[in-house]
Amino acid sequence: MSQRWSRKKSRLPLAGLLFILVVTFMILFNERSIQQIHHHAASHTQNLREPSTFDFVKPNVPRINYLGAHEVLDRFSKCNSTKEYSGKKIGWVDPFEDHPGQVTKEEQKCDVFSGKWVFDNSSSYPLHKESQCPYMSDQLACQKHGRKDLEYQHWRWQPHACNLKRWNAIEMWEKLRGKRLMFVGDSLNRGQWISMVCLLQSVIPRDKQSMSPNAHLTIFRAEDYNATVEFLWAPLLVESNSDDPVNHRLSERIIRPDSVLKHASKWQHADILIFNTYLWWRQDSVKLRWSSEEKGSCEEVKSAEGMEMAMDSWGDWVANNVDPNKKRVFFVTMSPTHQWSREWNPGSEGNCYGEKKPIEEESYWGSGSDIPTMRMVKRVLERLGPKVSVINITQLSEYRKDGHPSVYRKFWEPLNEDRLKNPASYSDCTHWCVPGVPDVWNQLLFHFL
C-alpha cells in the first residue's frame, strides 16, 4: 500500500506543473486579448466622437419594469454635500438614428400652428361648460371664482391656410377605444388633462365613468370604451424630490438626471403619451444626484443644463422603447407666461390682470418663452424623428394674455391685506382658465391623432 502511494505521489508534481503552465498561458493570452479589445473599442469611440472634456453617462432607463435600483428621491431627500459639477453629460444613441424626420401629408399641406385667434360667439364655443364638468380644478375655474368677462372662452384658433379639425367627443372616444391616453408633466400638462376630461366626460353616462383620487397617477375611466385618460405628475420628467403631486414646493430642487425609472414604470404601457416640461426649470440652478452616488453628494448646475440632461434621458427612453406603429408620443412645447404688460403695451406697469383680449401683433414673442431652451428641445426632438410628434402651442398661446386666471382662482395660501389691495401682485399669469386655451391644445392633439 505504501509503495503504491509513493508512486502516485511522485507523479503528482509533474501533472500539477503542467496544469499550472496551461492556466498561466491562458490567463496571459486572455489579458492580452482583453487589452486589444479595449484598445480597439477606445479607438473606435474616439473616431466616432469629437474630442470632449465631458464624461458621458448612459441614462438609467427601464426596459421591463422599475426594480428600485437606487434610493428613490422624495420630498425628504437632501444633499449631504454639494460639490463642483463634474462635467458628466447624458449620452444616448437612438438605435434607429439614421431615420430622417418624417413629415405627414397634413403637415406638408398646412401649418396648423400658424394662424390667428377669431372671436366666435356662436353656440359652438366654448366647447364645454365649466359648471357642467364635475372634475374641474379650482385652480382653473375662473368663472366660478368671480370672473365676469367670459369672452376668453369664445376665441377660436384659425390656421392661416386651412381649418383645424372640428372637435368631436364621440370620434375622440372611438380613437381611444381600448387604449390608455396619458398626459405626463407639470401643472400646465395637468391643466390640459383636465381640459381633455371635461371635453370628453359629457358624452359618457355618469354611472359609466369614474375618477381615481388625486395621486402620482390619476385616472379617468370610461367603462363603455374600455379607455382611460390619465395624468402622471412628473414635472421634471426625470426622478426628483418634487415628485409628490401635492407636497412639492421645496427650497432645494434635486434631480437624478440619468434616471426616468420611477416615472417610466408608470407611463411605459400607455398607448398615447403627451409629455411636457419647462415651467419647473425656470429657476437659477438645480442639484444633481447621480444614480451611482450612494453618499447623498450632489452637484449643482444651471437649470438650463439640468433640463438638457433630463431631455436627453427622456429621449433615450423614447429612442429605445417606442415603436411609432404601436405607440404614439407627443411633446407639447413650452407654455408662455404674461408677467410684464410693458412687453405688449410699452409704458405700462402690470401683468395679465385685467386683460380681456388677445395680442394682435403678428409673431409676438414675450420674455416668458426662452428661445435657447426651444432650440435645445428642438435638437432632442429632431434626433427622435417620427417617434415623436410635436404640438407647438407656444406661438399661438403667446397671443393669449387674456386667458390666464389672474386673481380668479383658488389660492392655497391666505392673502394678506397689502396683496389684496394690489391684485396684480398675486395674479396667476402662468396657468390657463378652462374652458379656454388648453381646449385648443387638445383640439390640435385630436387633429393629429
Swiss-Prot record:
InterPro entries listed in its UniProt record: TBL (IPR029962), TBL_C (IPR026057), TBL_N (IPR025846)
Annotated transmembrane regions: 12-29
Chain's gene name: TBL35
Residue interval(s) of motif GDS motif: 185-187
One BP annotation, GO: xylan biosynthetic process
Subcellular location: Membrane
Highest rank taxon of the organism: Eukaryota
Record-stated family: Belongs to the PC-esterase family. TBL subfamily.
Disulfide linkage: none
Protein function: May act as a bridging protein that binds pectin and other cell wall polysaccharides. Probably involved in maintaining esterification of pectins. May be involved in the specific O-acetylation of cell wall polymers.
GO cellular component, one term: membrane
Leftover remarks: Contains 2 motifs that are conserved in esterases, but it is unlikely that this protein belongs to the catalytically active pectin esterases.
Topology of the protein relative to the lipid bilayer: Single-pass type II membrane protein
Name of the protein this chain belongs to: Protein trichome birefringence-like 35
Source organism (scientific name): Arabidopsis thaliana
GO molecular function, one term: xylan O-acetyltransferase activity
Motif (DCXHWCLPGXXDXWN motif): 428-442
